[in-house]
């Protein structure tokens, strides 16, 4: 296309001459054609002395791919990337691109010879006289040059394009122009990069050159040093390829690079700017490049010359009327008496069209004629409405809406023409009927709100293309444009569904910049019914068949002339044999004959390409985001659907019905070299992709989460197969080119942990679903009639898991860690190198705290060598373990975690099962091949067990359950500081048999007696059998609290018979005071409830004196808290309502009434915790004498519903009902010290009846019981109150304070405890306390009163810490 001026020595002139490249369109021409052009322009006398050569020369010790990626912003060279390392082919660091963020070269044309500096203008050198068009981005759109704008005196031009470029952002232009030495100032200009497409060479350190490719094959780029000369020309020496001053990626521009840009990073403006275009070089073996600096004044003038006078709309004068004469190419915009002349296309001269700029708020334009503006565009500085008279259209270079503007466009376009839209403002399409034109938008917002015509037809555009990553298109409704005609070009843009339901049958997305979103509050429904494929097939090339054999591309068309006839064949293999002898043309494995009709042969290839596309997977490179649900029905032909972009639907559901769905990362795109694919399955560098949605719904589907993909979503699976961490992957061999997707399927296994896929969420499996986990996993699994297989070493179950009729297998290096409990009605299996860890739940914001968790399964099968089961950090696991292979079982930890207090009922239950240990297991271990270790752990034998070795530290092994005795057989036992608890019925016992070796010390051997031996009964029951020579000190008799007793067995060691045996002789038992005290405290909870009600019996008296009316209704609420020894505390809320009637007798007011009460109380202590809900009712009578005396009588019945959990003697939770009766009498006398001050002595007596209760249960295998009989408390109280009344016109308030002594006259009920060691009786005691109270009673109106009282007590065994009583009374 172009040729840098080459300086050659001419013997005729005796000096250097500039040998020019008279460029033509030769991108695909041969060097011979280029040489011919050159020969025509060079004096013949000089040809024998000057070499015709062209090159872009780079270092040979750096991979050529680096230079290619640099030029196309691929690989590591993403715009904005910082401190990019550059390595040589041996992996040694050459240097870093650390002086500036990576430049964006998208403004450079696809062929590298020009750069976009304004939406409609490019810059290059004027000696590039042959090129007529340019393209940008992935090169899918071509822009024609309508005016070359050649500079009159320097080698520079700034061509104008026919349309506004929508794919890319123009490059910023230097603000310093040709200022002397401007670009030598390294404090401001910190880096210089270039890009070009000349013939490619590499150079070694000895200067040897190797040709890589011809001119214009592709672009390369690199660094250059600080200019040696900087004025109108920049001169530097990038040809000194290994000189560090030129940076780590020197790139010497040479013939073929004419017009290519030189960029500089302007640190002051914090952006890259184009400063110059390449003009000349110093020969292939030289080092110097010459660039012409951008003449900014000239450039600005060129652009300014293409504007007509600006149009300023004046409000109140009516719309701007736009008339246009197509013949003259001129038009007029008029408002009132003011006119503006505009220029449009004249004949075929697009450049005759000038740009128009509109200002004036809320402007209005009416097209009276169709306007053909050629290369002229419209720019709106303010908001406008543009409409047209019926059928009138507008065409031109495009529309720019400035930031903050909203232009309403009511004008339809022309078929075959696209409206190009730029600018940060909004363009609202609001025409009528069907607009046959298309839209290409590169910035801002376009709202499609086309209105229906009289026939109901709507089409805002025939097609929509979004590019550059900046634009948004908003759908007014679902009929605005055929979704299948929406495409996303280079870097894409956002399609906002705006709450509409939209169906795509194909997705045309060039890259990750393609976004489908919904920003509306109304949820959109997106249906991806991807049954259509691209039917545009390029004309296939026809290769020639070599008679001597060769290689080719299977599926391509080839020809050969035989007997003067051209025969056409389709190649079936990558290589073929000789066609002269052995004739490979007859081999169906190598060739398929498709006739001698060229057109039919070509059509056959096209048809097969289309047939292949019908089966090809669908790959979507873009993004789905926002408020929407996405549905993907089965794709015809069994085509798979692959997302290697991203999904972000936090409140949305993505559903797949049948077929295959794959979420995966995206291979990093690299620049192609000589036709190489931009991506491959075996490349190491992949981009991570994130997939987030509320729910992924799968039905009869096959789902894969593959490498470099993260999925954050719940999954609902119905008869589907889920593979997390799949090695299945797809690449698009046309990725980054904008061409039709060419998928390649294969496997790709990540090399690093960061490249592995990961999942977070909860999965529900139903109806024969299958889940294979090979990725990092965090979340929960509920499986019903399904199967789960784990091979990932990083699976974390953070939610409770449920497996019903479902299998769970961990194998091949898989590691399952469960943190929140698990249920399974089947066996969990650990295969070879599989590990299962059962743990408590980590407490948030703590370093080492865990809440207990329960694991209930039918069992665990350790079936493969090196299988492992770990129960640790607050986990309680139940279910037998069977080890059929050499495996390990770990219970507890030598570095145990701190167990947190329970916050949930499940956690509290789990904690109670641990019995103070760090971890617990309940079940048998069989198979004889497991190595078991215990640290601070509890093992409750659920059956006979056989293991290879057992290491026990600070742990306990006990046997419980039915009355069947257990035998633990172990080859090697190593126990220290541990407790072994065995049961006996005085005839048989649980046993421990050690067959090979027993070591250890400080172990306790405890016995749980299922029956109580008779006094003096001698036993002779072997408990432990170990090999001869085992130390007799390994086990000693231990004391164990069982029930309410401390039980110590009596043992002797027998070393006869070739074994060492520990034999049980009998036991000693004594009462355990702590356990008995806890039991007594639990049984006395009824007394505390009784006292709560007692303190509520007499709280009505302040309401009655001096009341008006014959009857009254009242309500009160009392809230309080109390405490006692043993960590006891309670709190209660008491609600009481009543109704009474007043009887006025001689000298006395008698009130008789009825009351209903409800009390909600809770209690907690070292021994128990629980709640009581009480309801009751009663009758009362109160007599108030005029003398000041009073008598109050009450009788009440209360029913108590109790729910308490005891933490002693394995009591557990008990739910029981009790009741109580109350009969109370109170009397007192109010002495008035003054008219408004009084003192009131009081006396009260309460007699009651509290029902007894009996509990029977087992602690281990020991029968226990607790009982207390009905008892009748008698409580007295004496005290005095002092009060004063404050009165106003319509109100009065009586304040009072008092103290009293409350005391028991009878002992509380007796508690009887019984266990295997006998019966223990705990007699009830008396209690007393001092009460203090302050309060007030207010008369609000004649018939309303309100009272408030505070109370507490001291000096008692049980005290009221605080109580608040509020009452309200209404008289009528």
Curated annotation (Swiss-Prot):
Optimum pH is 7.0-9.0. One of its GO terms (biological process) is proteolysis. The record marks 1095-1096 as: Cleavage. Residues 56-301 form the Peptidase S6 domain. Optimum temperature is 37 degrees Celsius. The active site is at residues 127, 155, 258. Changing residue 258 to I: No mucinase activity. This is Serine protease pic autotransporter. It comes from Escherichia coli O44:H18 (strain 042 / EAEC). The lineage of its organism: Bacteria, Pseudomonadati, Pseudomonadota, Gammaproteobacteria, Enterobacterales. The gene is pic.
């Amino acid at each position: 296309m172009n040729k840098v001026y080459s300086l050659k020595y001419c013997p005729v002139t005796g000096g250097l001459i500039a040998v020019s490249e008279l460029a033509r369109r030769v991108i695909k021409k041969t060097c011979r054609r280029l040489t011919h052009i050159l020969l025509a322009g060079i004096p013949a006398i000089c040809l024998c002395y000057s070499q015709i050569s062209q090159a872009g020369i780079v270092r040979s010790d750096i991979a050529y791919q680096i230079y290619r990626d640099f030029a196309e912003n691929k690989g590591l060279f993403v715009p904005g990337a910082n401190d990019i390392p550059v390595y040589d082919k041996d992996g040694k660091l050459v240097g870093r691109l650390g002086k500036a963020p990576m430049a964006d070269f998208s403004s450079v044309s696809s062929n590298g010879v020009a750069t976009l500096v304004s939406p409609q203008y490019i810059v290059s050198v004027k000696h590039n006289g042959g090129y007529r068009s340019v393209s940008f981005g992935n090169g899918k759109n071509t822009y024609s040059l309508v005016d070359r704008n050649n500079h009159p005196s320097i080698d520079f031009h700034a061509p104008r394009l026919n349309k506004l470029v929508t794919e890319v952002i123009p490059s910023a232009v230097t603000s310093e122009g040709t200022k002397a030495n401007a670009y030598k100032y390294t404090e401001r200009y910190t880096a210089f990069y270039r890009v070009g497409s000349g013939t490619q060479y590499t150079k070694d350190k000895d200067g040897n050159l190797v040709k890589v490719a011809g001119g214009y094959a592709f672009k390369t780029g690199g660094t250059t040093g600080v200019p040696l000369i900087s004025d109108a020309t920049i001169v530097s020496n990038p040809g000194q390829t290994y000189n560090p001053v030129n940076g780590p990626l020197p790139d010497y521009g040479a013939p073929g690079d004419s017009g290519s840009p030189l960029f500089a990073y302007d640190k002051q403006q914090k952006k890259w700017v184009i400063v110059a275009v390449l003009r000349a070089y110093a020969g292939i073996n030289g080092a110097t490049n010459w660039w012409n600096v951008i003449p900014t004044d000239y450039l600005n003038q060129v652009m300014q010359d293409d504007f007509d006078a600006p149009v300023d709309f004046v409000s109140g004068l009516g719309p701007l009327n736009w008339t246009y004469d197509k013949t003259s190419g001129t038009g007029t915009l008029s408002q009132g008496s003011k006119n503006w002349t505009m220029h449009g296309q004249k004949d075929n001269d697009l450049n005759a069209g000038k740009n128009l700029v509109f200002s004036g708020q809320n402007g209005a334009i009416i097209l009276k004629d169709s306007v053909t503006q050629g290369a002229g565009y419209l720019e709106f500085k303010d908001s406008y409405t543009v409409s047209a008279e019926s059928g009138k259209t507008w065409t031109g270079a495009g529309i720019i809406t400035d930031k903050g503007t909203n232009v309403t466009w009511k004008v339809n376009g022309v078929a075959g023409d696209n409206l190009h839209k730029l600018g940060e403002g909004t363009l609202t399409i609001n025409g009528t009927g069907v607009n046959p034109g298309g839209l290409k938008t590169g910035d801002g917002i376009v709202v499609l709100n086309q209105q229906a015509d009289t026939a109901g037809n709507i089409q805002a555009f025939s097609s929509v293309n979004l590019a550059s990553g900046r634009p948004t298109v908003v759908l007014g409704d679902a009929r605005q444009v055929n979704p299948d005609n929406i495409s996303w070009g280079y870097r894409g843009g956002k399609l906002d569904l705006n709450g509409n339901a939209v169906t795509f049958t194909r997705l045309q997305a060039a890259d990750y910049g393609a976004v489908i979103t919904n920003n509306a509050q109304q949820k959109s429904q997106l249906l991806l019914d991807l049954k259509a494929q691209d039917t545009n097939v390029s004309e296939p090339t026809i290769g020639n068949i070599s008679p001597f054999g060769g290689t080719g591309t299977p599926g391509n068309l080839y020809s050969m002339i035989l007997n003067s006839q051209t025969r056409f064949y389709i190649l079936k293999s990558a290589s073929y044999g000789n066609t002269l002898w052995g004739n490979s043309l007859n081999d169906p494995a190598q060739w398929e004959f498709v006739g001698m009709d060229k057109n039919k042969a070509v059509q056959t290839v096209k048809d097969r390409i289309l047939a292949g596309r019908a089966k090809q997977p669908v790959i979507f490179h873009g993004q789905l985001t926002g408020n929407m649900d996405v549905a993907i029905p089965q794709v015809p032909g069994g085509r798979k659907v692959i997302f290697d972009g991203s999904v972000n639907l936090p409140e949305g559901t993505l559903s797949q019905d049948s077929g295959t769905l794959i979420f995966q990362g995206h291979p990093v795109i690299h620049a192609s070299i000589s036709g190489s694919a931009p991506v491959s399955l075996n490349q190491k560098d992949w981009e991570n992709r994130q997939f987030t949605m509320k729910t992924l719904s799968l039905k009869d589907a096959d789902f894969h989460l593959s490498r470099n993909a993260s999925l954050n979503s719940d999954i609902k699976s119905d008869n589907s197969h889920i593979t997390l961490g799949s090695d299945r992957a797809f690449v698009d061999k046309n990725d980054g080119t904008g061409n039709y997707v060419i998928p390649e399927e294969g496997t790709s296994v990540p090399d690093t942990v960061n490249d592995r896929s990961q999942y977070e969420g909860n999965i529900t499996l139903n109806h024969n679903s299958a889940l294979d986990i090979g990725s990092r996993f965090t979340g929960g699994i509920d499986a019903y009639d399904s199967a789960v297989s784990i091979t990932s070493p990083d699976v974390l179950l953070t939610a409770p898991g449920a497996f019903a009729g479902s299998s769970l297998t961990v194998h091949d290096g898989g590691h399952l860690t469960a943190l929140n409990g698990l249920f399974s009605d089947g066996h969990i299996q650990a295969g070879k190198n599989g590990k299962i860890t059962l743990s408590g739940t980590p407490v948030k914001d703590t370093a080492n705290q865990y809440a207990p968790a329960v694991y209930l399964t039918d069992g665990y099968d350790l079936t493969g060598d090196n299988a492992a089961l770990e129960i640790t950090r607050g986990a309680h696991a139940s279910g037998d373990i069977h080890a059929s292979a050499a495996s390990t079982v770990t219970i507890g930890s030598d570095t145990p975690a701190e167990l947190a207090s329970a916050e949930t009922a499940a956690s509290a239950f789990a904690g109670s099962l641990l019995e103070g240990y760090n971890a617990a297991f309940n079940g048998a271990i069989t198979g004889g091949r497991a190595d078991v270790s215990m640290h601070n752990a509890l093992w409750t034998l659920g059956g006979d067990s056989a293991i290879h070795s057992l290491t026990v530290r600070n742990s306990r092994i006990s046997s419980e359950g039915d009355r069947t005795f257990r035998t633990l057989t172990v080859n090697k036992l190593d126990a220290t500081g541990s407790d072994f608890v065995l049961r006996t019925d005085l005839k048989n016992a649980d046993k421990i048999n050690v067959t090979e070796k027993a070591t250890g010390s400080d172990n306790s051997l405890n016995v749980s007696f299922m029956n109580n031996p008779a006094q003096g009964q001698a036993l002779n029951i072997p408990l432990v059998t170990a090999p001869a020579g085992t130390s007799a000190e390994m086990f000693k008799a231990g004391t164990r609290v069982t029930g309410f007793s401390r039980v110590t067995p009596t043992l002797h060691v027998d070393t006869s018979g070739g074994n060492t045996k520990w034999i049980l002789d009998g036991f000693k038992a004594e009462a355990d005071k702590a356990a008995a005290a806890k039991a007594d405290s639990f049984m006395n909870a009824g007394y505390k409830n009784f006292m709560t009600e007692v303190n509520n019996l007499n709280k009505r008296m302040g309401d009655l004196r001096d009341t008006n009316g014959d009857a009254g209704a009242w309500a009160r609420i009392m809230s309080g808290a109390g405490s006692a020894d043993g960590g006891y505390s309670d709190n209660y809320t008491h609600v009481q309502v009543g109704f009474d009637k007043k009887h006025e007798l001689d000298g006395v007011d008698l009130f008789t009434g009825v009351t209903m009460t409800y009390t909600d109380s809770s209690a907690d202590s070292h021994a128990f915790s629980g709640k009581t809900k009480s309801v009751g009712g009663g009758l009362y009578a109160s007599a108030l004498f005029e003398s000041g005396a009073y008598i109050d009588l009450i009788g009440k019945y209360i029913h108590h519903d109790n729910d308490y959990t005891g933490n002693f003697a394995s009591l557990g939770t008990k739910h029981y009902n009790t009741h109580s009766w109350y009969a109370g009498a109170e009397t007192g006398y109010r002495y008035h010290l003054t008219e408004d001050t009084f003192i009131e002595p009081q006396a009260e007596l309460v007699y009651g009846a509290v029902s007894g209760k009996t509990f029977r249960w087992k602690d281990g295998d020991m029968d226990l019981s607790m009982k207390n009989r009905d008892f009748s408390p008698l409580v007295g109280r004496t005290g005095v109150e002092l009060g004063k009344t404050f009165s106003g016109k319509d109100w009065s308030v009586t304040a009072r304070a008092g103290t009293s002594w409350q005391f028991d006259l009878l002992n509380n009920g007796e508690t009887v405890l019984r266990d295997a060691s006998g019966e223990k009786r705990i007699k009830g005691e008396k209690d007393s306390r001092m009460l203090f109270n302050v309060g007030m009673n207010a008369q609000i109106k004649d018939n309303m009163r309100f009272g408030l009282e505070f109370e507490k007590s001291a000096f008692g065994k049980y005290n009221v810490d605080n109580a608040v009583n509020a009452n309200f009374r209404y008289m009528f």
